[in-house]
Amino acid sequence: MSFVAYEELIKEGDTAILSLGHGSMVAVRVQRGAQTQTRHGVLRHSVDLIGRPFGSKVICSRGGWVYVLHPTPELWTVNLPHRTQILYSTDIALITMMLELRPGSVVCESGTGSGSVSHAIIRSVAPTGHLHTVEFHQQRADKAREEFQEHRLSQWVTVHTQDVCCSGFGVVHVADAVFLDIPSPWEAVGHAWDALKVEGGRFCSFSPCIEQVQRTCQALAAHGFTELSTLEVLPQVYNVRTVSLPLPDLGANNLETNMGSDASPFRSGTPMKETVGHTGYLTFATKTPG
């Protein structure tokens, strides 16, 4: 099993996502002889998981069932153990697009945190790209290395344990893109410039507060970055339904027309009241050659 390449059968050591019902999932490490307790009963790894195809519907001990899903960065994001606050797929999708990530890209990232963005970046740059991710907290860095090893992603990622604001990314002029998710990104802008290739590259920073954005933009302009832009992603859910409106009364002179016409149903989309709130601002910039 790899987050980069799909495999059909579940093997010992794989990470599997158990779908327990609407909106309820859990990630498990498949181990021979192990058991997982769910609200539907016990799931025995040796009998119920190992050797079965991903996507199987598995009956638990109490008669309920779960679906065993192949892991993806998106599923991992909603099931990972939180060591820090994380970014979710809505923001990650825009980051991936605006940084122009593709197979073969080299990316520098800080901080690693819980690895939510890291998994998505690795999936985007594999099989010929690489991620250099920097985490100053030793225990979080060690845990990230362990997870990358378990998910068979180690060949595409190098974890550096250092303060990016003081020591940079550990590489110079190799990156096609840089992503920062740290409290003071403006202090690392100079290191981001040095990490990007001489011929240029893309920059992105995530910040919850507009004051952080202002200081980051000032630092970006001072270091020579161009095409600065800041975006906020706020998804809006729409309720789509079929509506039939009554025909208007056009008076006695139009009685025959009214009697011969039926109300035409049409589909209408109205925004739902519930909407996702503010997560943060995404600031993008470009290092141009020269």
Curated annotation (Swiss-Prot):
Species lineage: Eukaryota, Metazoa, Chordata, Craniata, Vertebrata
Q: Name one GO biological process term.
A: mRNA processing
Please give the family membership noted in the entry.
Belongs to the class I-like SAM-binding methyltransferase superfamily. TRM61 family.
Cross-referenced PROSITE patterns: SAM_TRM61
| InterPro entries, per the entry | SAM-dependent_MTases_sf (IPR029063), TRM61_C (IPR049470), tRNA_MeTrfase_Gcd14 (IPR014816)
Q: How does it assemble?
A: Heterotetramer; composed of two copies of TRMT6 and two copies of TRMT61A.
E.C. designation(s): 2.1.1.220, 2.1.1.-
Q: Name one Pfam family in it.
A: GCD14
GO-annotated cellular components: nucleus; tRNA (m1A) methyltransferase complex
Q: Where in the cell is it found?
A: Nucleus
Where are the Phosphoserine modifications? S264
Top-rank taxon of the source lineage equals: Eukaryota
Q: Where does substrate bind?
A: T279
Q: What does this protein do?
A: Catalytic subunit of tRNA (adenine-N(1)-)-methyltransferase, which catalyzes the formation of N(1)-methyladenine at position 58 (m1A58) in initiator methionyl-tRNA. Catalytic subunit of mRNA N(1)-methyltransferase complex, which mediates methylation of adenosine residues at the N(1) position of a small subset of mRNAs: N(1) methylation takes place in tRNA T-loop-like structures of mRNAs and is only present at low stoichiometries.
Q: Which organism is it from?
A: Mus musculus
Question: Which reaction is this enzyme known to catalyze?
Answer: adenosine(58) in tRNA + S-adenosyl-L-methionine = N(1)-methyladenosine(58) in tRNA + S-adenosyl-L-homocysteine + H(+); an adenosine in mRNA + S-adenosyl-L-methionine = an N(1)-methyladenosine in mRNA + S-adenosyl-L-homocysteine + H(+)
Q: Does the keyword Glycoprotein apply?
A: no
The annotated region (Substrate) lies at 20-22, 35-42, 64-65, 85-89, 110-117, 180-183, 205-212
State the name under which the record lists this protein.
tRNA (adenine(58)-N(1))-methyltransferase catalytic subunit TRMT61A
Sorted UniProt keywords:
Acetylation, Methyltransferase, Nucleus, Phosphoprotein, S-adenosyl-L-methionine, Transferase, tRNA processing
Primary gene name? Trmt61a
Sites binding S-adenosyl-L-methionine sit at L87, S114, G115, S116, E135, R140, D163, V164, D181
User: Where, per the database record, does this protein carry N-acetylserine?
Assistant: S2
Annotated GO molecular function terms are: mRNA (adenine-N1-)-methyltransferase activity; tRNA (adenine(58)-N1)-methyltransferase activity
